[in-house]
Amino acid sequence: MAISKNLPILKNHFRKHWQERVKVHFDQAGKKVSRRNARAARAAKIAPRPLDLLRPVVRAPTVKYNRKVRAGRGFTLAEVKAAGLTAAYARTIGIAVDHRRQNRNQEIFDANVQRLKEYQSKIIVFPRDGKAPEAEQVLSAAATFPIAQPATDVEARAVQDNGESAFRTLRLARSEKKFRGIREKRAREKAEAEAEKKK
């Protein structure tokens, strides 16, 4: 909760001379410039290599976000192998590899293998020894290989009312599960009573 009004601060667990240790962000604008300059300096230092690593396409988890794809941490070992690379070599040419991630989706697997192959076709690998030839500098792998949202074409159709209610169906299913035991018990007792009457 933010502090408001000129009232005593509740639960103020401050130590002595706490005023000297208050963290302020008066340098926010300056830090922004510093970060930009640092990025530019690093780009010049490691040129013509890109600043960042190539990241995979992953589908975001949970029902709320799973209609979208985004950049993941790293390619799986299976994706790297399918693209004809080894994990150790892939890391040396600017490809992020995550040994923990598992492939549970064939569509995403195929998209990532294709992404790796496209990256391989466009990348220029210089020998470790010897002078690097003049080459166009790629500032960002993320900008060069962007992650696009897949198009979802849904055709418009007339609303159909077949008289069924999803709410009613769920309520009946829940009720069936809840009272199954007692209903089976009643049916069993009724059958036993019928058998006793026949005797």
UniProtKB/Swiss-Prot annotation:
Keywords: Cytoplasm, Phosphoprotein, Ribonucleoprotein, Ribosomal protein
Residues bearing PTM Phosphothreonine: 144, 152
Cellular component GO terms held in the UniProt record: cytosol; cytosolic large ribosomal subunit
Compartments where found: Cytoplasm
Keyword Phosphoprotein annotated: yes
GO BP term, example: cytoplasmic translation
Gene3D superfamilies recorded: 1.20.5.110
Note: Present with 54200 molecules/cell in log phase SD medium.
Subunit structure: Component of the large ribosomal subunit (LSU). Mature yeast ribosomes consist of a small (40S) and a large (60S) subunit. The 40S small subunit contains 1 molecule of ribosomal RNA (18S rRNA) and 33 different proteins (encoded by 57 genes). The large 60S subunit contains 3 rRNA molecules (25S, 5.8S and 5S rRNA) and 46 different proteins (encoded by 81 genes).
Function: Component of the ribosome, a large ribonucleoprotein complex responsible for the synthesis of proteins in the cell. The small ribosomal subunit (SSU) binds messenger RNAs (mRNAs) and translates the encoded message by selecting cognate aminoacyl-transfer RNA (tRNA) molecules. The large subunit (LSU) contains the ribosomal catalytic site termed the peptidyl transferase center (PTC), which catalyzes the formation of peptide bonds, thereby polymerizing the amino acids delivered by tRNAs into a polypeptide chain.
Family statement: Belongs to the eukaryotic ribosomal protein eL13 family.
Protein name: Large ribosomal subunit protein eL13B
Gene, per the UniProt record: RPL13B
